[in-house]
Amino acid sequence: MKIAVYPGSFDPITNGHLDIIERGSKVFDKLIIGVLVNVDKKGLFEIEERVELIKKVTKHIKNVEVLSFNGLLIDFLKASNAKIILKGLRAVSDFEYEFKMALMNNKLDPDIETVFMMTSAQYSYLSSSSVKQVAKFGGCIEGLVPKEIISDVIRRSKI
């Protein structure tokens, strides 16, 4: 069974993330969305909320599981019996960073492989940071995040 982990902070999950999840779920037998606890950032949503939002927008995908983790990604993969890291790429700048991370992860565990998936062109500009910025100033986020969570993002952005 090919089990992959798609890690990220997903704060909030965007349509670009969902695109990678939907496409990745067709490539792997099981896709675990690893929602990371980033102690260096104060998130828009708490970790438990992010997990629930992702579950809400991925409930139609049967081979997806959503879990939170902290610590090393490699340790999370081992605990999940996964050998593959799935990463979405928007631009060359993403590749430079992710390539270095893939090399580090492979150094920590040579059995781990990183698979890069290009984001669909219509989402190549999209990031959680840009969604938060637009929502904070009252801009329209339709088409940027899944429709099921638009009200959650707007409500939280006004706090």
UniProtKB/Swiss-Prot annotation:
A single cellular component GO annotation: cytoplasm
UniProt keyword annotations, A-Z: ATP-binding, Coenzyme A biosynthesis, Cytoplasm, Magnesium, Nucleotide-binding, Nucleotidyltransferase, Transferase
Enzyme Commission identifier(s): 2.7.7.3
Pathway connected to this protein: Cofactor biosynthesis; coenzyme A biosynthesis; CoA from (R)-pantothenate: step 4/5
Binding site for ATP: 9-10, 17, 88-90, 98, 123-129
Stored SUPFAM superfamilies: Nucleotidylyl transferase
Keyword Nucleotide-binding listed: yes
Site (Transition state stabilizer) location in chain: 17
One Gene Ontology term of the molecular function aspect: pantetheine-phosphate adenylyltransferase activity
Catalytic activity field: (R)-4'-phosphopantetheine + ATP + H(+) = 3'-dephospho-CoA + diphosphate
Needed co-factor(s): Mg(2+)
The keyword Nucleotide-binding is assigned to this record: yes
Chief location category: cytoplasm
Residues that, per the record, bind substrate: 9, 41, 73, 87
A biological-process GO annotation: coenzyme A biosynthetic process
Function description: Reversibly transfers an adenylyl group from ATP to 4'-phosphopantetheine, yielding dephospho-CoA (dPCoA) and pyrophosphate.
UniProt-listed PANTHER family: PHOSPHOPANTETHEINE ADENYLYLTRANSFERASE (PTHR21342:SF1)
HAMAP family the UniProt entry points to: PPAT_bact (MF_00151)
Protein name in the entry: Phosphopantetheine adenylyltransferase
